[in-house]
């Protein structure tokens, strides 16, 4: 476990250096930052980073996944990030639209570009390099580079603190499955290169889903993996209701160790949209508590 933590720390340093080089190049691009006053964000974590760098007053609209902080819910909605409507966006007269490669559809983005909207497609891969590049790009575009560095520093410090706590735990990594209810058919499971996979590993768990991205697995396939802990994610239900929704489409999971031992953890779905967000360190601590209940004080130790 200690070797794993040291490796993570080295990755943090390498990603920071590479992202700094990216930021230097990115700062020379785009609209004159001094005059940007109207911004739209599509992607929950992206919106949270805009708030973290002090740009909330520049936001004139957000997508439906942008629910944190709660104050964003008072802003006009431009719909779901994958299904933006040009008219709805242009009505808000934005100068810049921040999003990821999940943002679309492409014809709408082209229409927005033609109308003079600066489209900023940020990297949202689930790693420290991508989040560093994204936050620094936000800072460069909005003339908030100093605030971006401060927000990144706080985020990395939070991750480092959780890594130090994890290094104190002497125990086998629990077998974990993150299951995302889609309301119909087999639920999705979070595999590699997802925020869910990153969270599981940062909290000291073993992700049983080895496929790339999100993939639907049959009820029997998930039972064969026999997770010790199940993280449930549901846009419409919370807690036991979320588990019941998942079991209604994957009934075999009721025989898994996780369900039999009541080791079910609910996760806010907005954490999984738009890359790594600023709230993740606190959720790593919560998952660590759930993964290692025999060490109840470790995740919260100052």
Predicted regions and their residues:
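Extracytoplasmic ligand-binding site segments that recognize negatively charged/polar headgroups
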Residues: 107, 123-137, 171-195, 239-241
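A short, structured surface patch at a secondary-structure boundary
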Residues: 38-92, 96-103, 208, 238
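Short helices/loops that flank or line small-molecule/ion binding pockets
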Residues: 86-93, 218-229
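A ligand-binding cleft/hinge motif common to bilobed small-molecule-binding domains
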Residues: 103-114, 232-248
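His/Asp/Glu-enriched short active-site or ligand-binding loop at hydrolase and phosphoryl-transfer sites
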Residues: 63, 190-215, 234, 266
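Basic- and aromatic-lined ligand-binding clefts that recognize polyanionic substrates
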Residues: 38-50, 147-203, 272
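Bacterial N-terminal signal peptides
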Residues: 8-20
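Structured C-terminal subdomain patch of bacterial secreted/periplasmic proteins
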Residues: 37-38, 130-140, 149, 235-302
């Amino acid at each position: 476990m200690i070797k794993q933590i040291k490796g993570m720390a080295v990755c943090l340093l390498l990603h920071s250096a590479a992202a700094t080089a990216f930021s230097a190049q990115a700062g020379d691009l785009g609209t004159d930052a001094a005059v940007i006053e109207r911004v739209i964000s599509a992607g929950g974590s992206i919106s949270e980073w805009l708030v973290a760098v002090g740009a909330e007053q520049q936001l004139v609209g957000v997508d439906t996944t942008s629910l944190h902080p709660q104050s964003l819910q008072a802003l006009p909605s431009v719909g779901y990030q994958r299904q933006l409507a040009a008219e709805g966006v242009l009505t808000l007269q934005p100068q810049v639209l921040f999003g990821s490669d999940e943002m679309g559809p492409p014809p709408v983005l082209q229409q927005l570009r033609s109308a003079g909207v600066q489209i900023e497609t940020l990297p949202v891969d689930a790693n420290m390099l991508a989040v560093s590049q994204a936050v620094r790009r936000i800072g460069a575009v909005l003339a908030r580079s100093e605030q971006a560095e401060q927000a990144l520093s706080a985020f990395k410090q939070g991750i480092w603190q959780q890594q130090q706590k994890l290094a104190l735990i002497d125990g086998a990594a629990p077998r974990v499955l993150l299951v995302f209810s889609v309301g119909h058919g087999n639920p999705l499971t979070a595999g590699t290169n997802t925020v869910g996979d990153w969270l599981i590993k940062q909290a000291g768990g073993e992700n049983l889903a080895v496929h790339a991205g999100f993939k639907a697995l049959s009820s029997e396939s998930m039972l064969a993996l026999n997770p010790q802990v199940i993280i449930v994610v549901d846009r419409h239900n919370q807690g036991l209701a979320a588990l019941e929704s998942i079991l209604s489409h994957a009934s075999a999971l009721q025989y898994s160790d996780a369900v039999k031992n009541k080791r079910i953890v609910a996760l806010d779905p907005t954490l999984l949209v738009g890359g790594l967000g600023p709230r993740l360190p606190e959720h790593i601590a919560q998952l660590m508590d759930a993964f290692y209940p025999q060490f109840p004080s470790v995740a919260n130790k100052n």
